[in-house]
């Protein structure tokens, strides 16, 4: 089970991948709590229902007891690309390992599905996201007009080392993620 950072939310901190049946309720829970994750930024457009309906099995949530501490909305494509649409940690839980637990869980699942690379994007003004992704080993490339004219973004990219018996013999290189492979990720709450 994905256990990680010490939480002050009244219970053990665990990471789970929601089921599609849980998607609509989780989507509503996230939308209702957006200010507690994103402050005054309007990020509703990042949270379309498809991320927790059709792609629920690739999403990750971290809870401390019944409190949602963080979530990651992502997908692993047939072309072996893992993409992170949104990752967020509740403001009071930042700096306690929740974001890393979200990524560890997602990347281990993506790796098990054969993903070779993961990508994510943010706005150039989001210095916290840029620093966080760099600490995880991502490269960060500014891309002019990435999201349309006048909408520049920073594209994060990270090579994933494959799962397998020989993995332990090879140290991860720059731009690769050294997370521990796991296949025991729980489904649902």
Per-region residue spans from a language model:
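A short, internal acetyl-CoA/4′-phosphopantetheine-binding micro-motif in the GNAT/acyltransferase core
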Residues: 87-94, 122-124
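Short secondary-structure boundary/hinge segments and terminal tails
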Residues: 106, 111, 128, 150-152
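Conserved N-terminal entry element of GNAT/NAT acetyltransferase domains
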Residues: 1-25, 158-189
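Conserved GNAT acetyl-CoA-binding A-motif
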Residues: 110-122
């Amino acid at each position: 089970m994905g256990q990680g950072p010490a939480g002050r939310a009244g219970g053990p901190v665990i990471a789970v991948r929601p089921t599609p049946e849980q998607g609509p309720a989780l989507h509503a829970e996230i939308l209702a709590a957006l200010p507690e994750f994103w402050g005054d930024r309007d990020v509703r457009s990042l949270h379309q229902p498809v991320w927790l309906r059709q792609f629920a099995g690739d999403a990750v949530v971290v809870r401390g007891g019944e409190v949602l501490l963080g979530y990651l909305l992502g997908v692993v494509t047939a072309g072996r690309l893992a993409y992170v649409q949104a990752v967020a940690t509740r403001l009071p839980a930042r700096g306690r390992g929740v974001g890393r637990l979200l990524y560890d869980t997602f990347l281990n699942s993506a790796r098990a599905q054969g993903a070779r690379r993961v990508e994510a994007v943010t706005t150039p003004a989001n210095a916290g996201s840029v620093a966080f992704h760099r600490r995880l080993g991502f490269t960060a490339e500014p891309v002019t007009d990435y999201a349309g004219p006048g909408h520049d973004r920073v594209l994060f990219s990270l090579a994933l080392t494959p799962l397998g018996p020989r993995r332990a013999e090879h140290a991860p290189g720059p731009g690769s993620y050294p997370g521990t492979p796991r296949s025991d990720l729980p489904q649902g709450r």
